[in-house]
Amino acid sequence: LVIVIFLKNLFAMSGLELAKLLDKRLKPNDIKSVNTMILTNKDNKKKTLELISISKDDSKKQMIWFLKPRKDKGISFLKIEKDNEDDFMTMWLPGFSRFRRIKSSQKSDSFMGSDLSFEDLTNRTIEDYNYNIIKTNEDGFYFLESIPKEIESEYSKHITKIKEVEDGIFIVYEEDSFDKKNNLLKNKVFNFEKI
């Protein structure tokens, strides 16, 4: 009985270890993508935006250009994440012929009228969070709780649903983000297609 308990503890993984495995997973350093964003308002009216996104240095630098609809064409967003400094974020608004600087205090603002905030467009730094595996299930999913330490955030925590799909390869399937009162604020679902 003692041996069985020892082996079970030997193979148990901490929340921090799981977060580090996710952070180190294979991913492209530079990405160029053409995306469609569909916004649906409370009256179920839809607005479709088309955009190009280019990310470099593990998404620490990102540029987004909006192509459609015509009234949003030319709007662009630039993000440069910095270590030990506030991130640099700005939007070019061609209708006003000016830039809008996004300050740290504005990171919870909506991005282009969507449910995404500017904070959602930034990478999370492992050292800025405390991690706990709050449960696992029979389907092999881990539920990882990430709680911000002292950083300014619109969130009190995130709960991420993760699965090991191959030996040492973990994929995020879903994430719930909670506001400062611990109410569910956002649910993100990630779909993958093998090509």
Annotated model-derived regions:
Residues 14-94:
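N-terminal mature ectodomain segment of secretory-pathway/periplasmic proteins
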Residues 78, 109-111, 116-124, 138-195:
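Gly/Pro-enriched, hydrophobic low-complexity segments
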Residues 1-6:
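N-terminal export/membrane-targeting signals
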